[in-house]
Amino acid sequence: MPDIGVLYIVSTPIGNLEDITLRALRILKDSSLIAAEDTRQTKKLLNHYKIHTPQMSYFEHNRFKRIPQIINHLNSGKDIAVVTDAGTPGISDPAYKLIRAVIEAGCRVEAIPGASASITALSASGLPSDRFIFEGFLTSKKGRKAKLERLRTIEATIIFFESPKRINKTLNDILEYFGDRPAVIARELTKIHEEMIRGKVSDLLSYFTEKTPRGEFVIMIGKDDPNVFF
């Protein structure tokens, strides 16, 4: 019976293709298969580094089909690398469901660290990083207001992801529930048009009311503390 393969959780660049580790490149090259959230997006990275490993799509809506296939592949002794479109798989990403299933099946999981939008944004924000909460994307459905009500009481920097279509609504809601706290928005991290906007929540709302929001956003809200300011 062959040894059980390893599922490698491989972090990939969030924009700049140079932001990938030597180890990640080796794993992507040596694995027998890459499970990618969007194979077209991952193909750009693979082509850039002349990696020819075959791909399989893995995303939220095909996971029930793909998870058994991936586990069978691992049980046959073959290693698989799982990647998301950008950043670290499993962080605000459906890969965590695959990872849980692989662990339950008795297979080995190994993380290959690298880029993460939330940590990249926080490190350059100027907000306290001794304690932070990563919330990911706020739901647009029932429970959004209750979630904000709970988060406002936490003494930590709060990190959200948001899309350009919803950025102004989310900033309005944050202003209503959190008050006019110090905040930072990181936009298009590591890309040509990277931007960090710092100020109060109301300042950021004014900025994106006057300027059409574009790109990918990380919102960071400082805790309610007079020592935290911009």
Region roles according to the model:
Residues 1-61:
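Glycine-rich, flexible N-terminal cofactor/catalytic loop recognition
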Residues 4, 157, 161-230:
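A contiguous loop/helix-start segment that scaffolds small-molecule binding in enzyme catalytic cores
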Residues 6-7, 77-81, 157:
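Loop/turn-to-beta-strand initiation segments
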Residues 14-16, 85-89, 164-166, 224-226:
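Short glycine-rich anion-binding loops that position phosphate/pyrophosphate groups of nucleotides
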Residues 28-34, 106-109, 157-158:
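Short active-site oxyanion
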Residues 57-64, 137-141:
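Conserved helicase motor
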Residues 59, 67-116:
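Glycine/small-residue-rich loop that forms an oxyanion/phosphate-binding "nest" at active or ligand-binding sites
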Residues 97-154:
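Class I SAM-dependent methyltransferase SAM-binding "motif I" and its flanking Rossmann-like core
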